[in-house]
């Protein structure tokens, strides 16, 4: 019978640990605080911001919000970012993206303080991951995948893992994390030849291609452990992953659902990064 790798127990365990860590920091006189910078008022950004604030409240983390006008200039934005960087009461920064065209995201990646960069935008934090140093602030989605694998005690040492997707946000850093835990990693993408066959021969299949229900039963075997990173519009008002869940669920060893899988853990990783950042400041 297929094991469903639900996020709920992973999140519950992480939040309980975070509550204890936050309480310990508060006892030392530190109040872990998240600074949230939002440009404009896109409904999905506002919804996610409110969700993050609620999650922070449940574990004792304070928040400061910086809602900015959609037409803010690069000069004005830089002044706000510098202010938040230099504010000792703010320990981590969350910046909503994508940004409007007048704001240069490549410049902003270098502008954000690496010590407060809990969403791992800064090249300095990504560089650590690629050097095999996992002690700093980690990219949230790859770290969420690793948290699920560890919670369910899925053995990585010597395992063959196929990562489908080569983005700098998920595929590449996740591959480095898997390598650090002694998995043998193959990175695949849209130009990979015989992709279904490559995936079917893996112990762990991680789908991060950004294509709705692309992975069907041709890509998996009965011993496959499938991690679905995708969050796509299913076209019926619902979301779906990169994996065709209904076609695959009864034909694999284990699988993460969408929703209720990787995405649900990602926000908790963000807060874990905040606590890490607070401890180091």
UniProtKB/Swiss-Prot annotation:
Family annotation (SUPFAM superfamilies): Aminoacid dehydrogenase-like, N-terminal domain (SSF53223), NAD(P)-binding Rossmann-fold domains (SSF51735)
One Gene Ontology term of the molecular function aspect: methenyltetrahydrofolate cyclohydrolase activity
Pfam family, one: THF_DHG_CYH_C
Sequence positions that bind NADP(+): 165-167, 190, 231
Pathway, per record: One-carbon metabolism; tetrahydrofolate interconversion
Keywords: Amino-acid biosynthesis, Histidine biosynthesis, Hydrolase, Methionine biosynthesis, Multifunctional enzyme, NADP, One-carbon metabolism, Oxidoreductase, Purine biosynthesis
Record EC number: 1.5.1.5, 3.5.4.9
Keyword rRNA-binding: no
Family assignment from sequence similarity: Belongs to the tetrahydrofolate dehydrogenase/cyclohydrolase family.
Name this protein carries in UniProt: Bifunctional protein FolD 1
